[in-house]
UniProtKB/Swiss-Prot annotation:
InterPro entries for the chain: Aldolase_TIM, OMPdecase, OMPdecase_AS, OMPdecase_bac, OMPdeCOase_dom, RibuloseP-bd_barrel
Gene3D superfamilies: Aldolase class I
CDD domains: OMP_decarboxylase_like
Active site: K65
Described purpose of this protein according to its UniProt entry: Catalyzes the decarboxylation of orotidine 5'-monophosphate (OMP) to uridine 5'-monophosphate (UMP).
Protein's name according to its UniProt entry: Orotidine 5'-phosphate decarboxylase
GO MF assignments: orotidine-5'-phosphate decarboxylase activity
Reactions catalysed: orotidine 5'-phosphate + H(+) = UMP + CO2
């Protein structure tokens, strides 16, 4: 589809029903943004929600964060690609073998679906990491998993804007950085610990910006999207 190729904005359809998601999609221009379908919406609606968004000419980021043994992870990624999605993700902590196999399955089947990895969830901080047994800090863990992702041949990682400069230097300019936790200055932080404004994120090296409530809960989502794009 490639309609939104010049826009860095991915609108997150989080905490929404199928009807609400499609109503929002009908207010947005597929030339100005892509859409993210996460676990809740996909679990409620299945592949039909992706098909409905494709019918509206949107490119879709399927945000299911697959994390399983290598073959299961790879087959799940392949199944996602068969839906015609633009991008899908896995957890980097699934390991090098799982990530590399998933990428190879895409290549073997001639899919150009972008495959990215999640390093550390943006809701987590150093204390949360320590509770899981990772004691050398957030920055070290993010860098380690980003390098593992690059080694596996994936296209990029999900990361906070604060990590973008470091990861671009570490993994190269072609390594895509997808940044959630994007808020406007007058928004609440909600459940994200590491947040940033759209312009700051792009300046710091992010390639794509995942924006949810700022747009989805706006009185006029289309106008808010235009405002964000004009600010970049």
């Amino acid at each position: 589809m490639n309609n939104a190729i010049n826009s860095p904005v991915i609108v997150a359809l989080d905490n929404m029903t199928k009807n609400a998601s499609l109503a929002l999609a009908d207010q947005l221009d597929p030339a100005l943004c892509r859409l993210k379908v996460g676990k809740e919406l996909y679990t409620r609606c299945g592949p039909e929600i992706v098909k409905a968004l494709h019918q509206r000419q949107f490119e879709v980021f399927l945000d299911l964060k697959f994390h399983d043994i290598p073959n299961t992870t790879a087959q799940a990624v392949l199944a996602a690609a068969e839906l015609g999605i633009w991008m899908v993700n896995v957890h980097a902590s699934a390991g090098l073998e799982a990530m590399a196999l998933a990428k190879q399955r895409l290549l073997d089947s001639d899919f150009d679906t972008l495959l990215i990895a999640v390093t550390v969830l943006t809701s987590m901080d150093n204390e949360a990491l320590m509770q899981t047994g990772i004691t050398d800090g957030l920055d070290a863990q993010v860098s380690r998993l980003a390098q593992l992702t690059k080694q596996a041949g994936l296209d990029g990682v999900v990361c906070s804007a604060q990590e973008a400069k470091t990861l671009k230097a570490l993994c190269g300019q072609d390594f895509k950085l997808i940044t959630p936790g994007i808020r406007l200055l007058d928004d609440n932080a909600d459940d994200q610990k590491r947040i940033c404004t759209p312009k700051q994120a792009l300046n710091d090296g992010s390639d794509y910006l995942v924006i949810g409530r700022s747009i989805t809960q706006a009185a006029d989502p289309a106008a808010k999207l235009q405002l964000i794009l004009q600010s970049l």
